[in-house]
Amino acid sequence: MKCPFCHTPDTSVIDSRVSEEGDRIRRRRRCPHCDKRFTTYETVELRLPQVVKQDGNRAEFDREKLRTGFVRALHKRPVSAEDVEAAMNRVVQKLLSLGEREIASHKIGEMVMGELYKLDKVAYIRFASVYRSFQGAADFDDAIRELQGSDSRKEPDKP
């Protein structure tokens, strides 16, 4: 690693310790050229997968788009900002745990629907109406029947 003081390209590690949380490593380094010491931290870099759109285009995952989807579906519903944030974090964590480089946008939509189903059934129907492109009242009736017929402990069947 380059020395931040004299910019010599090679430094040596004189001490390494794992943090109490176990999620990073603290390293004390020494520059052989200027003899100064400094600390670095090593952490795991987790990357969210690229989103493959329905038209085949690819885009970086955008947490703000995820937030917008939740906020629109939950507009004027009795769900706290903390619950929305927790649901978003669960979606992001699922994406990270997949370990994939790419994910189809419809899979993210299904994850969002699953979280909305747990949070608020009206928001679930709102999101489903846009996500599944409801064409009329019959589509709403089907979705409501699906909700009414499903066990309260499980998510409704996904297409």
Swiss-Prot record:
Obligatory cofactor(s): Zn(2+)
Keyword Metal-binding listed: yes
Co-factor note (free text): Binds 1 zinc ion.
Annotated keywords: ATP-binding, DNA-binding, Metal-binding, Nucleotide-binding, Repressor, Transcription, Transcription regulation, Zinc, Zinc-finger
NCBIfam families documented for this protein: transcriptional regulator NrdR
UniProt zinc finger (unnamed) residues: 3-34
InterPro entries for the chain: ATP-cone_dom, NrdR-like_N, RNR_NrdR-like
Entry protein name: Transcriptional repressor NrdR
Reported function: Negatively regulates transcription of bacterial ribonucleotide reductase nrd genes and operons by binding to NrdR-boxes.
ATP-cone domain sequence ranges: 49-139
Species this chain originates from: Nitrosospira multiformis (strain ATCC 25196 / NCIMB 11849 / C 71)
Recorded GO MF terms: ATP binding; DNA binding; zinc ion binding
Family: Belongs to the NrdR family.
Domain of life: Bacteria
GO aspect biological process, one term: negative regulation of DNA-templated transcription
